[in-house]
């Protein structure tokens, strides 16, 4: 990591916990979609995961990491966390709740700890990539 690079909450926490990770900056590429980001970074699109924050009927919040090219099945997700139903968190509520903005939301370093579910497809990879806490930054790390 460059010494001049701004550290996000996610990068700070991973560093503090002494976890092995690598950052990938794609700011200059102009990439937006998961496929574009994967191409800009020379990575497999299936290894790119997006962070989705939801709210259950109970009012509890849940975080899901799903392959970036897929959509979250809200019915199945609700069943996994024991809720009758869940809905995606509104964009306007994301920053106050997590400390991150839409498009730069990392599952690591949120303001509070929320139950987090990672799609089982992640297990097939040695490492996966997800948002590093700002648009243009991905973190690559293992699940162990």
What are these regions (language model features)?
Residues 1-144:
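Extended, low-hydrophobicity, polar/charged segments
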């Amino acid at each position: 990591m460059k010494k001049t690079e701004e550290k996000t909450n996610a990068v700070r926490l991973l560093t503090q916990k002494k976890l092995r990770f690598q950052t990938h900056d794609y700011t200059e590429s102009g990439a937006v979609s998961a496929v574009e980001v994967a191409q800009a970074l020379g990575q497999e699109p299936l290894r790119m995961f997006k962070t989705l924050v939801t709210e259950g009927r109970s009012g509890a919040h849940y975080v899901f990491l799903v392959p970036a090219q897929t959509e979250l099945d809200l019915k199945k997700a609700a069943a996994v966390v024991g809720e009758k139903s869940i809905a995606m968190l509104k964009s306007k509520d994301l920053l106050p709740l997590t400390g991150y903005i839409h498009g730069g939301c990392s599952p690591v370093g949120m303001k509070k700890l929320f139950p987090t579910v990672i799609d089982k497809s992640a297990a097939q990879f040695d490492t996966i990539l997800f948002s590093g806490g700002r648009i243009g930054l991905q973190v690559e790390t293992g699940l162990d």
